[in-house]
Curated annotation (Swiss-Prot):
UniProt signal peptide: 1-22
Protein name (database record): Putative uncharacterized protein YOR055W
Keyword Signal among record annotations: yes
Origin superkingdom: Eukaryota
Extra remark: Almost completely overlaps VHS3.
Organism lineage: Eukaryota, Fungi, Dikarya, Ascomycota, Saccharomycotina
UniProt keyword list: Signal
């Protein structure tokens, strides 16, 4: 469920992305190479899992899901390896599924510590905050 949409300046985005993050290179049949950045930013009392992608592939994506590892079958994937103080090394898998869906998966212990998934649409600098209910999808049905 989409709980909040906010607009941020480039400076603000740079501050947020200053946390732990890593970039995956995804190769799509219709779009060529796509860079997706996945990261973790820990705020006092809560964790944040974030992912970014450019506008063009997102224009045809109707859903954004976040699941524990192993529950999503991707058509194309990229792995981001993040080092966190709380969880140690964590591997995130970002990919495009056949719905089409932009998805990110991570170990369950990460989801337990990161109740919010942040989705960035870089062309408009929009951040949609999606509340993650453990064991359920968090879906973002509208890009705006």
């Amino acid at each position: 469920m989409c709980t909040d949409v906010a607009f941020f300046s480039l400076d603000c985005l740079a501050t947020w992305l200053g946390g732990v993050c890593s970039t995956s290179d995804l190769r799509l049949p219709n779009f060529g190479s796509l860079n997706v950045t996945v990261g973790i930013l820990f705020n006092p009392g809560s964790g944040v899992l974030l992912t970014t992608a450019p506008e063009v592939p997102l224009a045809f994506m109707i859903d954004l899901v976040c699941e524990p590892v192993g529950l999503v079958d991707f058509l194309t994937t990229g792995v981001s390896r993040l080092e966190t103080e709380e969880n140690g090394p964590v591997e995130f898998v970002s990919g495009i599924a056949d719905e089409p869906i932009l998805a990110c998966s991570a170990p369950e212990r990460v989801f337990e510590a990161t109740p919010f998934l942040l989705f960035f649409r870089l062309d408009l600098f929009v951040i949609a905050s999606l509340h993650y209910n453990y064991g359920q999808y968090s879906s973002f049905w509208s890009l705006l």
